[in-house]
């Protein structure tokens, strides 16, 4: 799907976002579901989705990005970093024009003012702690200093690998 979408200036998320909107609309129609409490939690590739879907599906009350948050542009273009996608065979990772428009801090800004959280294992191979902290600092500054809602934004660091903490 990704390869077919790219020539049309689309990504896999052009397909995923409408699916999520439909799912959230359906869940909201069920009497046993509190539509104000539907949240998004994503691990690994799901973490990518946690950054890209909630900005466009406003029905999600919060978003948690686990084992994925980083400096996306650096991750895609660096030829020096061992963390770079340049050295992997993951062809579906590169997304049309994303580096020219959004990094993770900007995607998190589109989630605001809804609560946003990052789960980060110190031994996760996504990126070094310093890179994650640098990108998250921009998000924290937005939530705390600019919007005055610092209680809605956090990062949880834990000793562990590319996994859910808890």
What are these regions (language model features)?
Residues 74-130:
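The feature captures the conserved acid-bearing segment of alpha/beta-hydrolase catalytic domains
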Residues 49-90:
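Hydrolase active-site cap/lid region
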Residues 41, 66-67, 119, 158:
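Alpha/beta-hydrolase-fold catalytic nucleophile elbow
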Residues 1-29, 76-79:
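Cap/lid segment of the alpha/beta-hydrolase catalytic domain
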């Amino acid at each position: 799907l990704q390869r077919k979408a790219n020539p049309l200036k689309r990504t896999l998320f052009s397909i995923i976002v409408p699916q999520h909107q439909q799912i959230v609309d359906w869940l909201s129609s069920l009497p046993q579901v509190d539509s104000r409490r539907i949240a998004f939690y994503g691990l690994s590739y799901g973490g990518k989705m946690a950054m890209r879907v909630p900005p466009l599906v406003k029905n999600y009350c919060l978003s948690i990005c686990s084992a994925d948050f980083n400096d996306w542009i650096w991750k895609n273009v660096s030829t020096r970093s061992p963390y770079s996608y340049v050295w992997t065979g993951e062809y579906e990772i590169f997304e049309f024009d994303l580096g020219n428009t959004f990094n993770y801090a900007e995607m998190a800004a589109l989630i605001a003012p809804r609560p946003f959280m990052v789960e980060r294992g110190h031994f996760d191979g996504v990126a070094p702690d310093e890179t994650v902290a640098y990108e998250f600092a921009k998000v924290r500054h937005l939530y705390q200093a600019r919007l005055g809602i610092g209680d809605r934004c956090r990062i949880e660091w834990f000793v562990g690998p590319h996994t859910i903490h808890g």
